[in-house]
């Protein structure tokens, strides 16, 4: 069920929702329905207009929503989140349901270049799977020099205090304000002083990206007295002009799964294999190729 966000699919119940989400959605439905009864002149469409008995039973709650919205949404759970009662949800639970439960809608064309938004929507949900991981973002090469950029004055001590051990950044070779040219990835193990850089064209980082690498090296030297362990990919395996963003996301996802850096860069995915990952990362599944198991190793087959 590839519309679900990473590790969100419940195969037994064929749903992307967890029971806590369904409980809050049922409460929101009841609040909305109660307001309707107080304002009968307003135009609402509910189907079965009975309140839902609230209990932590996933099968039961799924059936309640199917009974009420089956004619409108069928089995489309995204459709359910577009119903008016969802406006009664607030805070983190609403954000989790709307932005964390499902894969995002990606580019419609199978070889369309990934935007900053596309990349962020792929990567941010992995923070929920790995609580000690933070995705810094898809950023320009000179991000560390731009005050509105997340790498500007980045505080590694604070990240460690917050329980963050791993961070990742996807850089564009262009600087802030430029249109964008090529995506590359950086993965950092803060506690152990390890930094891995991966350009699918097999090149060293540009001087602007080197600034960010050097800042981490200086931090780790001050903190531990040791030099960082730094590796970069020397193998050129991208054979097209469209998949650099997908390669960059895939590199980080595989690093998070525990796959060794050397294995990732020496066993790279072909164009067909990396393009197939779009069918895992985006719910509209634009690629004509069957998803490769290494698109998301920890979520393979789910």
Swiss-Prot record:
Q: Where does it localize? A: Virion
What highest taxon heads this organism's lineage?
Viruses
State a single Gene Ontology molecular function: cysteine-type endopeptidase activity
Source species of the chain: Acanthamoeba polyphaga mimivirus (APMV)
Query: Belongs to which family?
Result: Belongs to the peptidase C48 family.
Q: Name one GO biological process term.
A: proteolysis
Q: Any idea which UniProt keywords this protein has?
A: Hydrolase, Protease, Thiol protease, Virion
Would I find Hydrolase among this entry's keywords? Answer: yes
Tell me where it mainly resides. virion
Main EC class the enzyme belongs to: hydrolase
User: What EC numbers are recorded for this enzyme?
Assistant: 3.4.22.-
Give the annotated active site.
Answer: 182, 199, 244 (nucleophile)
GO cellular component terms, alphabetically, are: virion component
Name of the featured protein:
Putative thiol protease R355
